[in-house]
């Protein structure tokens, strides 16, 4: 598949990034529905990993953001991922930020986006999840939740609780996204006072949902790379205090040091891809040093090869997730990463 993708990529890179993104996913979905995709993709790697009571078929997952609305679940599952994370979804539909809002920086193997949680709303996404064969067959599917842009930051807990209630029945795990730079003030939720309030509220809501549904769903927290040691230690301690089950490190960065002077390098938004790799690894190592084996870490950020995926595991992650690497390396990156991670 990678050879085919290397032929397609120059053509895709001539198209507006967001249009290319949607076109690629639509064609993947069409190929999957017609039965062609499985013939083009290398057989998935079976390398079971158990984390938070969940069995992942292999340790390579899809990061949130690629399929925000659950429209392409079965097509993406066919690429060989061990798990998928859908979203970010919000309680109410919202259009996101004005276009253009996605930019490629090929020289740095990077993407800048300021999408702004554009999505059809959590209820529409849940309906699509229920229709997917992947979910019906018991595939591991995380739901990434956020707050609406119109909701004041002081009332953020309300939105997260509404979204959690909506996805609870269909999610294998639920990720609390407080680290996107594209929703005003969202990252303020990583501060001690607001994070305590949010995690406490979600913990209470989960207890009620557990009683109602008879099952305790794991809660993961996704954090930013732009954190100092004190911030990381504080967040790690709060995760343990409030019974959060895992941490995803990291989201996109607001730093532009690695892309200075490049076309689009000064665009507002979150920078992902190769430039965030080291920053993500540093956060993972710091979390591991603080948490030890008390809480698992999922590593994401800048994985462009199997070696990069291995670095995340060596830094302290138990699983990894891909996004920008798929844009630059193509679907075969899933197989390559899973193959390297299966090796002793």
Curated annotation (Swiss-Prot):
Query: A cellular component term (GO) from this record?
Result: plasma membrane
Main localization is: membrane
Q: Where are the transmembrane segments?
A: none
Q: Name one GO biological process term.
A: 'de novo' UMP biosynthetic process
| Keywords tagged on the record | Cell membrane, Flavoprotein, FMN, Membrane, Oxidoreductase, Pyrimidine biosynthesis
| Pathway info | Pyrimidine metabolism; UMP biosynthesis via de novo pathway; orotate from (S)-dihydroorotate (quinone route): step 1/1
| EC number from the UniProt entry | 1.3.5.2
Reactions catalysed according to its record: (S)-dihydroorotate + a quinone = orotate + a quinol
Q: Which positions in this protein are listed as binding substrate?
A: 68, 113-117, 177, 182, 251-252
Position of the signal peptide? none
Provide the protein's localization.
Cell membrane
What is the uppermost EC class here?
A: oxidoreductase
Provide the membrane topology annotation.
Peripheral membrane protein
**What remark does the entry make about the cofactor?**
Binds 1 FMN per subunit.
Please give the subunit comment from the record. Monomer.
User: What family classification does the UniProt entry report for this protein?
Assistant: Belongs to the dihydroorotate dehydrogenase family. Type 2 subfamily.
- The molecule here is called Dihydroorotate dehydrogenase (quinone)
Q: Which organism is it from?
A: Polynucleobacter necessarius subsp. necessarius (strain STIR1)
**The encoding gene:** pyrD
